[in-house]
């Protein structure tokens, strides 16, 4: 099961995800949650508590990346879990998405874009 909650400050939103990003009802709920944030300059997807992602989940991330960026909003992945990072690397999608390490606090992240990092194996 996938859950998502949103935190907003200024022109930035953080969508905190927990559970599994896999084919099923959770994907459309996550899609709708992210697309409701299009009025923001930057949307971070916090993937630190995602323990599994499948091809359907990857497809959703690519769809969101393309859709959101095409409308002038940046979509960035925040602190992907080890499993998500491994899948992103295996599929070479780590070169498509901007990955950010965890911020010390969410407010720190929301007030600055942070520094992207290279995903390590």
Model-based region annotation:
Residues 1-52, 63-121:
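STAS-like cytosolic regulatory interaction modules
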């Amino acid at each position: 099961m996938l859950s998502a909650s949103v935190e907003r400050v200024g022109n930035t939103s953080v969508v905190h995800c927990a559970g599994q990003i896999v084919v099923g009802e959770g994907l459309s709920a996550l899609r709708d949650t992210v697309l409701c944030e299009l009025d923001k300059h930057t949307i971070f997807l916090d993937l630190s508590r995602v323990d599994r992602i499948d091809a359907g989940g990857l497809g959703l991330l690519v769809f969101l990346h393309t859709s959101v960026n095409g409308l002038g909003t940046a979509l960035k992945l925040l602190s992907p879990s080890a499993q998500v990072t491994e899948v992103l690397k295996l599929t070479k999608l780590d070169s498509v998405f901007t990955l950010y390490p965890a911020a010390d606090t969410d407010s720190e992240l929301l007030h600055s874009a942070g520094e992207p990092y290279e995903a390590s194996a």
